[in-house]
Swiss-Prot record:
DNA-binding region: 1-19
Protein name as catalogued: Histone-like protein p6
Organism domain of life: Viruses
Complex and partners: Homodimer. Homomultimer. Binds to double-stranded DNA giving rise to multimeric nucleoprotein complexes. Binding specificity for the viral DNA is based on supercoiling, the viral genome having a negative superhelicity lower than that of plasmid DNA. Interacts with the DNA replication protein p17; this interaction optimizes the binding of protein p6 at the viral DNA ends, thus favoring the initiation of replication.
Gene behind the chain: 6
Amino acid sequence: MRKMMQREVTYTTAQLARMKMEDGQVTAEVLEPVTLIGNLSVEQAQREINKRPEFKENPAQVVGVEPNTQLYELPLDVFLEHATVKERPAAKEEVAEVQA
């Protein structure tokens, strides 16, 4: 039996609209939803959308958010193939010894 690695990931689906003027009337053009990492409020999602280059020229307004959490699973050997090794930060005791 293969060893598996599991991780719960929370993401937010933001519903977007772009305001347009047509025949003197303001209309909302509904855009494709965008997935953002984390559990974001409408305000937080709006800040993230404003940072994206595809919305610099034609800004979009976040009209709703839907957070979702799912459990993902990956075989450990596949994870090790794709993962990068990260150095652990030095413990406080080790830092104190180096400074002494």
